[in-house]
Curated annotation (Swiss-Prot):
Protein known as: Small ribosomal subunit protein uS8
A GO CC annotation given for this chain: ribonucleoprotein complex
HAMAP family: Ribosomal_uS8_B
Gene transcribed to yield this protein: rpsH
Single GO molecular function: structural constituent of ribosome
Length: 133
């Protein structure tokens, strides 16, 4: 059976692993998922991730989750905004701080995938992929 929303599946795997207090979770690989994981690491929502070869053509990503001192996941909220059935686009002038700059928007622009803060700085709009805090 084919997957209709691979990014949504990745977010669900990360969300469920965090709630179950797992240290890592395995996510099927793709270029867009790698870009999203890079931004999650840069923003401090995950510790790290590494590429795991499944075979010569496929790779997965092993995501190392991050927790606070009380063993609560750093990622409190991970919401898929734009889905294959309902695309959500935003202009650069409409990008606002999410949750008083505690959260992050991830936007797919013509210059690549970036945070909402960077997209606003570069005056680029695009498709809102997800929001997290």
């Amino acid at each position: 059976m084919s997957m209709s929303d691979p990014i949504g599946d990745m977010l669900t795997r990360i969300r469920n692993a965090g709630r179950a207090k797992h240290d890592t979770c395995l996510v099927p690989g793709s270029k867009i998922k790698k870009s999203i994981l890079d931004l999650m690491k840069e923003e401090g929502f995950i510790r790290d991730y590494e590429s795991v070869k499944v075979n010569e053509t496929f790779e997965d990503y092993k995501v190392f989750l991050k927790y606070d001192q009380t063993k609560r996941p750093i990622i409190r909220e991970l919401i898929r905004v734009s889905t294959p059935g309902r695309r959500v686009y935003i202009k650069s002038t409409e990008i606002r701080p999410y949750k008083n700059n505690i959260g992050t928007l991830i936007v797919s622009t013509s210059k690549g995938i970036m945070t909402g803060k960077n997209a606003r700085k570069l005056k680029l709009g695009g498709e809102v992929i997800l929001k997290m805090s």
